[in-house]
Regions:
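Cytoplasmic-side transmembrane-helix entry/capping segments in multi-pass membrane proteins
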Residues: 90-95, 141-153, 199-208, 254-260, ...
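Intrinsic disorder in cytosolic terminal tails and internal cytosolic loops
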Residues: 1-23
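Transmembrane helix interruption/hinge and helix-loop junction motifs
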Residues: 109-114, 220-228, 343-348
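Membrane-embedded alpha-helical segments of multi-pass transporters/permeases
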Residues: 105-109, 186-191, 238-239, 339-343
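A gly/Pro-rich, aromatic-decorated transmembrane alpha-helix motif that marks the paired
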Residues: 149, 153-169, 394-406
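Cytoplasmic helix-loop-helix junction between adjacent transmembrane helices
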Residues: 119-151
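12-transmembrane solute porter fold
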Residues: 22-52, 59, 65-69, 73-84, ...
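Hydrophobic transmembrane-helix bundles of small-molecule transporters
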Residues: 156, 163-265
Length: 408
């Protein structure tokens, strides 16, 4: 782990070896590469009714656009990390760029639900890869903090920006906002580390089994008996495969690293808590304060922005802290937020609670990612980032479902 907030991480850029040891990709390029992913997650919330109206469909039908993006980032995160690990940064970047560009063209030019779903999925696959690449190329706590802060900050403002794009251009333009990440590709390519020598052969069986497991887990909150059974079956087969292929798509060195498992599990919990709070808060505020949907949206924006922006400084400030310290700090912040929300339904208290859970999730994502990458052997950094981000994204998927179940 780094000795200061500006010192390089040991494994963050692995497996690529830096062409010039003292230089890396500027953090601003990495933040621009990663941040627009959040447009695909949160951006459609205010423009889906317009899409449903123009397409002559129900709101439930057009939500498949968002579902496709969520599924794609879940499976794309480990798949694109595997591509980076085996083929290097350049090929992974160009593949992700092609997917994002194709997806943007589909959602902008073909106003039909199948095209919109395919385009959203393509953008999800590409931006998932961009985010994993960005996090694996960070070289200090400050750069990791900037990357994760960009994800949180864009996510907090995405609904309003997408709605504005819909008013000025079209709702299809709002769905194409993840393509803004393409602006960072030339800069990252120019400063990228040298591509690695070829590693172990690609493991197609491991990739298929992990994709099946992730797909099942994504649908557990929506159809838990079937999806849960499928997840157990896929997980069992993947575990058996891991025993016979230790250097496969999911390296044994990662799943046997205690710090990696701890930080990934905590990232899941922080994401589930934060996104569960985001799901519950609008109804609580509307009921307690009698606010309109617009007033609720404007009120929630500020604690979410606070969490995203403040996380940059928190990650830098905790760069030298031991794993045990951050493992207690960020879950403690999230627990404090949940406790406040349970103790009082005052709008001010609820917004403070959201600010705490947002800060915990955004800061924890960056701080835990750095420690997860440093906990695995050389050559496994990019794969570790893919698996770590997968845990965080699964938490984001489970959080609202858990919150809905608790709410009755």
């Amino acid at each position: 782990m780094s000795s200061s907030s500006d010192a390089p991480f040991t494994h963050a850029g692995a497996p690529d070896q830096l062409g010039t040891p003292d230089r890396g990709v500027p953090a601003a390029w990495l933040a621009l590469l990663a941040g627009p992913l959040s447009f695909g997650i949160a951006g459609p919330s205010l423009i889906l009714p317009d899409a449903a109206r123009d397409l002559g469909l129900t709101l439930g039908a057009v939500t498949w656009i968002v579902t496709a993006f969520g599924w794609a980032i879940a499976i794309g995160t480990p798949l694109m990390a595997g591509l980076q690990s085996h083929q290097g940064v350049r090929r992974a970047l160009l593949t992700c760029a092609a997917l994002v560009a194709l997806g943007a063209v589909l959602v902008v030019s073909v106003p039909s639900l199948p095209s919109l779903v395919l385009g959203s999925a393509a953008q999800g696959l590409g931006t998932a890869g961009f985010t994993t690449i960005a996090m694996s190329l960070t070289r200090s706590a400050r750069s990791m903090g900037l990357v994760t802060a960009s994800l949180a900050t864009v996510g907090s403002t995405a609904p309003l920006i997408a709605d504005l794009a819909g008013e000025l251009l079209s709702w299809q333009a709002g769905l194409a906002l993840p393509a803004l990440s393409l602006l960072a590709v030339p800069g990252v390519l120019r400063h990228r580390p040298a591509d690695p020598a070829r590693e172990a052969p690609f493991d197609p069986v491991g990739a298929v089994l992990l994709t099946a497991l992730v797909t099942a887990l994504v649908f557990v909150p929506h159809s838990w008996p079937v999806a849960g059974t499928a997840a157990v079956a896929a997980g069992g087969l993947l575990a058996l495969h891991l025993r016979s292929r230790r250097d496969g798509f999911v390296p044994a060195s990662i799943v046997r690293a205690p710090v990696f498992l701890l930080t990934s599990g905590l990232a899941f919990l922080l994401a589930a808590t934060n996104f569960g709070m985001i799901y519950l808060l609008p109804a609580l505020l509307a009921g307690q304060a009698d606010w309109t949907s617009g007033q609720v949206g404007a009120a929630i924006l500020w604690p979410l922005m606070f969490g995203g922006l403040a996380s940059y400084g928190v990650i830098a400030a905790t760069a030298k802290a031991p794993v045990k310290a951050v493992a207690g700090l960020f879950p403690g912040l999230a627990a404090a937020g949940v406790g406040l929300a349970c103790l009082s339904l005052s709008p001010a208290v609820l917004l403070i609670a959201q600010a705490l859970t947002s800060l915990a999730a955004a800061s924890g994502q960056g701080a835990f990612a750095a420690r997860a990458a440093a906990a695995v052997p050389d050559g496994a950094g990019s794969t570790a980032m893919g698996q770590f981000n997968l845990c965080y994204l699964l938490g984001a998927a489970f959080g609202p479902a858990i919150a809905a179940a608790l709410a009755g």
